[in-house]
A protein has these predicted regions:
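Hydrophobic alpha-helical transmembrane segments of multi-pass integral membrane proteins
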Residues: 94-135, 140, 146, 322-378
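Hydrophobic alpha-helical transmembrane segments in multi-pass integral membrane proteins
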Residues: 159, 236-240, 299-316, 361, ...
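Membrane-core helix-loop-helix motifs of multi-pass transport proteins
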Residues: 130-220, 369-376, 393-435
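Long, contiguous bundles of hydrophobic transmembrane helices that form the permeation core
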Residues: 1-9, 13, 40, 186-284, ...
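Short helix-coil transition sites and intra-membrane helix breaks within transmembrane domains
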Residues: 26-30, 60-61, 73-82, 111-123, ...
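Small-residue-rich segments of transmembrane alpha-helices in multi-pass membrane proteins
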Residues: 38-45, 97-101, 152-157, 292-306, ...
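Hydrophobic alpha-helical transmembrane segments
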Residues: 9-14, 32-35, 97-105, 119-123, ...
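Hydrophobic transmembrane alpha-helices of multi-pass solute/ion transporters
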Residues: 2-93, 240-323
Length: 435
């Protein structure tokens, strides 16, 4: 079916809403529901064949996230990530004013080291509620710290960065996808730090007490030391050959850079970890975020049906006809923020919103900066990812066991999200004007 069909697009959006409703109300896997709706709408209403809908399965993104999760899952299973976090906390026990920022660094480290945001957020939330809050840190500062592990995961090999990089490449920006992903990671990191600092002063994080009774963490085991070395080696080969190719060039470095794709390196790293007996492979495989992968696949398939029905044309035409060019990044941020408020953040929202970007750039005659528009979608989804109705926010709330604190969290987390969206909107508007 060619052209634009507004009715089909509306049906797809209803399908997304129903998938979210069925997930929250009946605990039905959102990705499976979305796949079913993709088949119903694609085959019965658009005249597609079943194999056409199956072809919309996001194989590249699915494979990337799986490979990353398998490799970095070794460090989660054998306790390497936990020991790294505890050692960083122990270092600040006599400097209580540094506790919040050490937790922030732990969050970034967990994200950069490949820990998936829900798992990293859960680790950070446990530390926040068991160490920071008893020391006088406001729970809402701890909520803002969740943005550190999310932003850390935007690094190219991170759980979210792999999705961002792959989806940007799918939109016709394959040559620029790597640079765009690094820029999005850098800007998101800066904005996240700014928001955490703002929350630190709003809720008086400088008044924290000294952490008492904290035992010195155990030293790294042989397996954990080997895991850290292996992670550093993988990161080295993922980054350095590309840098050398840029500055030196040559066929060997070009071929090496092509081979040193993060997903290939992660699979090689997983095999090496297996032979070094760093963790039980079956346990690592079981820890792989299969639910998130199925969710991502289902939403991507349903939104691909919507794209084929003309969703991108409808939204881009409305935005370009109604919104001034310099304000488009802000509205893309609002769109990402709204969608992420009730779903799984980047993994769900970015694949939905990313296809709009090329159409906006084309309709503007190339005056709009594609990276800024991709960044806008990421920041919007990023900041409302701590909404109490979103996965990240729900995980954070679930780690709290104090009923008196629980009463503040729902409205408080929404305030933190609002602060983030406003801050992100201001920065995006400036970037939209400057770039």
């Amino acid at each position: 079916m060619e052209g634009v069909n507004g009715t089909i697009v509306i049906l797809c959006l209803v399908g997304v809403a129903l998938a979210i409703f069925l997930s929250y109300k009946f605990n039905l896997q959102m990705g499976i529901s979305a796949m079913v709706f993709a088949f119903i709408i694609g085959v019965l209403f658009m005249g597609l064949r079943v194999k056409n809908v199956i072809a919309m399965f996001p194989t590249s993104v699915f494979f990337q996230v799986m490979a990353l999760s398998l490799f970095f899952g070794v460090g989660v299973v054998n306790g390497t990530m936990e020991i790294v976090a505890k050692k960083m906390l122990y270092a600040t026990r006599k400097r209580p004013y540094m506790l919040v920022f050490m937790l922030m660094l732990i969050g970034f480290a967990l994200g950069i080291l490949g820990c998936v945001p829900p798992a990293a957020g859960a680790i950070l939330a446990v530390m926040g509620f068991t160490i920071a809050v008893p020391s006088g840190v406001d729970p809402l500062i701890c909520a803002s710290l969740g943005y550190s592990c999310n932003a850390g995961s935007f690094v190219k090999w991170g759980a979210s960065g792999a999705i961002i990089n792959a989806k940007i490449a799918e939109q016709g920006y394959e040559a620029e996808s790597s640079a765009y992903t690094w820029e999005i990671f850098a800007i998101s990191t800066i904005v996240s730090i700014l928001l955490i600092v703002i929350c630190f002063f709003i809720w008086k994080g400088y008044k924290v007490k000294e952490v008492v009774g904290m035992e010195e963490p155990k030293p790294f085991t042989r397996e954990q030391k080997s895991t850290l070395i292996l992670i550093l080696v993988v990161v080295f080969f993922a980054v350095v050959p590309g840098i050398l190719k840029t500055f030196i060039g040559g066929p060997f470095l070009k071929k090496l850079t092509e081979f040193c794709d993060i997903q290939v390196l992660c699979l090689i790293g997983f095999i090496i970890a297996h032979f070094l007996k760093l963790a039980k492979p079956r346990e690592v495989i079981n820890k792989c975020p299969w639910n998130t992968l199925i969710l991502l696949a289902g939403i991507s398939m349903l939104m691909s049906v919507a794209v084929q029905a003309g969703a991108v044309t409808i939204i881009s035409d409305w935005l370009t006809a109604t919104i001034p060019g310099w304000l488009l990044p802000f509205f893309m941020c609002l769109l990402g923020a709204f969608l992420s408020s009730f779903s799984g953040g980047i993994t769900v929202v970015f694949p939905m919103v990313a296809p709009i970007v090329p159409a906006l750039v084309q309709s503007s005659g190339g005056t709009l900066n594609a990276m800024v528009l991709f960044l806008a979608a990421v920041l919007g989804a990023h900041f409302t990812g701590m909404s109490p109705f979103s996965t990240g926010g729900a995980v954070f709330m679930g780690m709290n066991r104090d009923e008196s604190i629980a009463k503040r969290l729902v409205t408080g987390q929404l305030v933190v999200c609002l602060l983030g969206v406003v801050l992100g909107g201001i920065i995006l508007t400036i970037l939209g004007i400057v770039l």
